[in-house]
Curated annotation (Swiss-Prot):
Biological function: Important for survival of the bacterium in the host during infection. Promotes the survival of infected macrophages by activating multiple signaling responses and suppressing apoptosis of macrophages during nitrate stress. May contribute to the adaptation of M.tuberculosis during stress conditions by maintaining the cellular integrity. Can phosphorylate the FHA domain of Rv1747.
Name this polypeptide is given: Serine/threonine-protein kinase PknE
Quaternary structure, from the entry: Homodimer.
Example of a GO cellular component annotation carried by this entry: plasma membrane
Membrane topology: Single-pass membrane protein
Main location as per UniProt: membrane
Cytoplasmic compartment spans: 1-337
EC class: transferase
Reaction(s) catalysed by this chain's protein: L-seryl-[protein] + ATP = O-phospho-L-seryl-[protein] + ADP + H(+); L-threonyl-[protein] + ATP = O-phospho-L-threonyl-[protein] + ADP + H(+)
Record organism: Mycobacterium tuberculosis (strain ATCC 25618 / H37Rv)
Pfam family, one: Thioredoxin_4
Domain Protein kinase: 16-275
Modifications the protein undergoes after translation, according to the UniProt entry: Autophosphorylated on serine and threonine residues. Dephosphorylated by PstP.
Gene: pknE
Amino acid sequence: MDGTAESREGTQFGPYRLRRLVGRGGMGDVYEAEDTVRERIVALKLMSETLSSDPVFRTRMQREARTAGRLQEPHVVPIHDFGEIDGQLYVDMRLINGVDLAAMLRRQGPLAPPRAVAIVRQIGSALDAAHAAGATHRDVKPENILVSADDFAYLVDFGIASATTDEKLTQLGNTVGTLYYMAPERFSESHATYRADIYALTCVLYECLTGSPPYQGDQLSVMGAHINQAIPRPSTVRPGIPVAFDAVIARGMAKNPEDRYVTCGDLSAAAHAALATADQDRATDILRRSQVAKLPVPSTHPVSPGTRWPQPTPWAGGAPPWGPPSSPLPRSARQPWLWVGVAVAVVVALAGGLGIALAHPWRSSGPRTSAPPPPPPADAVELRVLNDGVFVGSSVAPTTIDIFNEPICPPCGSFIRSYASDIDTAVADKQLAVRYHLLNFLDDQSHSKNYSTRAVAASYCVAGQNDPKLYASFYSALFGSDFQPQENAASDRTDAELAHLAQTVGAEPTAISCIKSGADLGTAQTKATNASETLAGFNASGTPFVWDGSMVVNYQDPSWLARLIG
């Protein structure tokens, strides 16, 4: 498959009926497809024949699709499935009605600063969640950002991300990315960290503000500019952009990764602060509008050809237009991309509290007047705090398991990083319920001598939001390879770092304050002790440990979960 390949519209690909070609790129084609087994409409990415036959890429995609599947953040496009059919690799994603940011910029020209900041804030939230899970994206660019009609933004194409927990696959790694947005260290032998994503997102912010990437020209000149050329100042390129944005761009695009912002959240907060006061309120209004838009959930049944997905409900009180006016760029012939189901993601953001925490760090310009969400169905996945852990699952799930972990325990980290995504999927599908238990018997092995107890306490602060997906996401993030402390290490994590981790997965200010205050330390000690007693009742003392209700689970067998849920 290449750029000149014929469309496969109307053909069958395994269980998928390819309805419409909606995108074509160097890695393959994207189709609107009907999954005839699960009876749903999806976005199906078919990788090119060249990549499908490349063993290095095959290994990369298998690893990265699993990494992407672990991310439970509303601005990350969810991956349903991935695999291979007749020698061709594919990724099955949820479908969205939206247009990519590159097409938007070509059509409309530069964005008003409040809108640019609001979109970057949402993508930064997605990236921070990925970084907390041990993944980097490596190809942040406008083409990989989808924006719905109500300005809800999504980051796509985590399939070529590089999980920092995995051994590098350098044969292909040197070619991943787009020159206009690549950090200087990507062109050298230096190890590229997650801060390369922060650099790329800053380049995207610059382009949103000015209409053009920071550096332009042929490949060699763009590479050289990223490495040696002075960082451009957006205020000198487009009249009316506040001078304060110059410092934001300068830090986000610093040549030395250590001089950049620590997180994408820091970048977006600085960008918001650079706005004029009135525009800060407009940016907050745009975020509120995107998060509270109400949409019906698309039907899971096959849709007849020509049927259109529901459009986002416009927000009644749109922000005044930003000046000065600019002439839009020539209209592109490129069609909007139909992608991941915005309706489902927005509903999740509303019901689960995983959306942007508007109360922090940005001010709101007025009270929120959205109607309360409807009550969940009786069989919905729910969260219950127990005396020795936290239950997450549906009352109709046929199997309930107990999972015991210790925040410092290295094998626990490996276990969670390997199986969290599959467990979360089984819970969401109501095939499985989980009682999560966190112990603290390695406190003495931590630098602070109480890290495990503090991590357990943080988990109960997050559980207090009564959001099952949020809790599972935070539980998994505690074991991220770039977050979990090691035994007898020279340092561990502070309460502020635990609070920031909670913020990256979508925790509300009340949970963050709870973590910083240490208010739940006593509760954590009691519940960790109770969990240890429960574990002892299974004639076990070490972690990780999994109990299926009748016997010990051999999680060393990669098929253990599939066997458990049938």
